[in-house]
Swiss-Prot record:
<dbReference type="Pfam" id="PF07541">
    <property type="entry name" value="EIF_2_alpha"/>
</dbReference>
<dbReference type="GO" id="GO:0006413">
    <property type="term" value="P:translational initiation"/>
</dbReference>
<comment type="subunit">
    <text>Eukaryotic translation initiation factor 2 eIF2 is a heterotrimeric complex composed of an alpha, a beta and a gamma subunit.</text>
</comment>
<comment type="function">
    <text>eIF-2 functions in the early steps of protein synthesis by forming a ternary complex with GTP and initiator tRNA. This pre-initiation complex mediates ribosomal recognition of a start codon during the scanning process of the leader region.</text>
</comment>
<dbReference type="InterPro" id="IPR044126">
    <property type="entry name" value="S1_IF2_alpha"/>
</dbReference>
<comment type="similarity">
    <text>Belongs to the eIF-2-alpha family.</text>
</comment>
<feature type="compositionally biased region" description="Acidic residues">
    <location>
        <begin position="300"/>
        <end position="309"/>
    </location>
</feature>
<dbReference type="InterPro" id="IPR024055">
    <property type="entry name" value="TIF2_asu_C"/>
</dbReference>
<keyword id="KW-0694">RNA-binding</keyword>
<keyword id="KW-0963">Cytoplasm</keyword>
<dbReference type="InterPro" id="IPR012340">
    <property type="entry name" value="NA-bd_OB-fold"/>
</dbReference>
<dbReference type="GO" id="GO:0043022">
    <property type="term" value="F:ribosome binding"/>
</dbReference>
<dbReference type="InterPro" id="IPR003029">
    <property type="entry name" value="S1_domain"/>
</dbReference>
<keyword id="KW-0597">Phosphoprotein</keyword>
<feature type="domain" description="S1 motif">
    <location>
        <begin position="16"/>
        <end position="87"/>
    </location>
</feature>
<dbReference type="GO" id="GO:0005829">
    <property type="term" value="C:cytosol"/>
</dbReference>
<dbReference type="GO" id="GO:0005851">
    <property type="term" value="C:eukaryotic translation initiation factor 2B complex"/>
</dbReference>
Amino acid sequence: MALTSRFYNERYPEIEDVVMVNVLSIAEMGAYVHLLEYNNIEGMILLSELSRRRIRSINKLIRVGKTEPVVVIRVDKEKGYIDLSKRRVSPEDVEKCTERFAKAKAINSLLRHVADILGFEGNEKLEDLYQKTAWHFEKKYNNKTVAYDIFKQSVTDPTVFDECNLEPETKEVLLSNIKRKLVSPTVKIRADIECSCYGYEGIDAVKASLTKGLELSTEELPIRINLIAPPLYVMTTSTTKKTDGLKALEVAIEHIRAKTSEYDGEFKVIMAPKLVTAIDEADLARRLERAEAENAQVAGDDDEEDGADQEGMQFDPEKEFNHKGSGAGRANEEDEEEEED
């Protein structure tokens, strides 16, 4: 049986804490959920706390199996009742909760793996390891995520665990797994832009402009551009260095803007570069799926001849627009051949 433990020292969250939950079921009174950070204890999102607007369909607001942040509005520790609210969660709360949850989950996964290697039996021993390490630092610094930073610090300074009173074998296994599992996490950064040109160059101008941004793509900071629906595009990059990633997209955007202006095209930043949360990822995936379905429908309505004329002139939503493998060159070659004919 797999060992389990809550992520933090306190057994229950406090009122106004924002916590990550997974939806179990939906009933007349509201939605039953598991509090993922508190060893899956049960809570309820009351129907009146799902949305600020009039509820027409619960399933449009919350779905079974979905994971999302909610705020705690009542805790009865004696009876184990926890009431939660979705409508009171702000976008800032979502971002902070998502980041905290990711760090706490990484520590939980690490300590459970260490416990498995050491052959711990029973959740009590896992909690004891938590008490000596993660929860020790949580109480010392009054910060739920400080353990993540200290664990990472131990890669270069193992003495941070000297105050934890760990057995030599436990400390050795812990340090070994931290080095393998807590390397700098890769973060995804995203920006939304609109790029269009209604002049003579048309789609070629758009391709040339986007390619200008993609020329800044490197192995360390790969830049991708996905088509959502003309003229909307999503730019993304993945990196272990958040600041460098944000800067890379900002510079790429300016290159695209400058190139677009050369063609008297239109360019607009819809969303400046920002760190992508789990919710953003899910939203982007849905939009790409929808765009793919719409493109497939349009493609099905066109005859083969029309499709041949437009080869290389549209982006595949499932593939990044890459300057090394774009269809722009192929399209231009075909146009030249047609002119010769």
